[in-house]
Amino acid sequence: MAAQGVGPGPGSAAPPGLEAARQKLALRRKKVLSTEEMELYELAQAAGGAIDPDVFKILVDLLKLNVAPLAVFQMLKSMCAGQRLASEPQDPAAVSLPTSSVPETRGRNKGSAALGGALALAERSSREGSSQRMPRQPSATRLPKGGGPGKSPTRGST
């Protein structure tokens, strides 16, 4: 039956749909960065910072969203420590590093731990830097719930 031999067979290089998807991806990658961002990216490369354009775009977007640069740095540091951990498990100092970042993201969003952790860290650091936060008064200076200074705290009846 000659009809079965028509079309791309298992020996062909790539199906036409896959090739079209590759071309779309290549076009999208070319337009990832704006002209200003491309200049920054080229400066980072000239300074010796080898980074993927997609990752660079994410970093620029985070900074545009007013995420604290320190939070972005700490997120990248923990992600890089995780990559080193996966490739070089014999380093004991690197093993203890990622465990310190786990409690920071535990009670937060259950979605992306890396991005959620960075946003939670940025949110926390922006709150800590706020001058509107007032220190709490120590509880020793407060009066007991029983009322005035003459009354004693509640006692059990005998």
Swiss-Prot record:
Residues 128-140 have a biased composition (Polar residues). It comes from the Eukaryota. Residues 111-122 have a biased composition (Low complexity). The modification Phosphoserine is found at S34, S152. It is found in: Cytoplasm, Cytoskeleton, Microtubule organizing center, Centrosome; Cytoplasm, Cytoskeleton, Spindle. Pfam families: MOZART2 (PF12926). One of its GO terms (cellular component) is nucleoplasm. Its main location: cytoplasm. InterPro entries: MOZART2 (IPR024332). Keywords: Cytoplasm, Cytoskeleton, Phosphoprotein. Residues 84-158 are annotated as: Disordered. Associates with the gamma-tubulin ring complex (gTuRC) consisting of TUBGCP2, TUBGCP3, TUBGCP4, TUBGCP5 and TUBGCP6 and gamma-tubulin TUBG1 or TUBG2; within the complex, interacts with TUBGCP2; the interaction plays a role in gTuRC activation. Interacts with TUBG1. Required for the recruitment and the assembly of the gamma-tubulin ring complex (gTuRC) at the centrosome. The gTuRC regulates the minus-end nucleation of alpha-beta tubulin heterodimers that grow into microtubule protafilaments, a critical step in centrosome duplication and spindle formation. PANTHER family: MITOTIC-SPINDLE ORGANIZING PROTEIN 2, MITOTIC-SPINDLE ORGANIZING PROTEIN 2A-RELATED. This is Mitotic-spindle organizing protein 2B. It comes from Homo sapiens (Human).
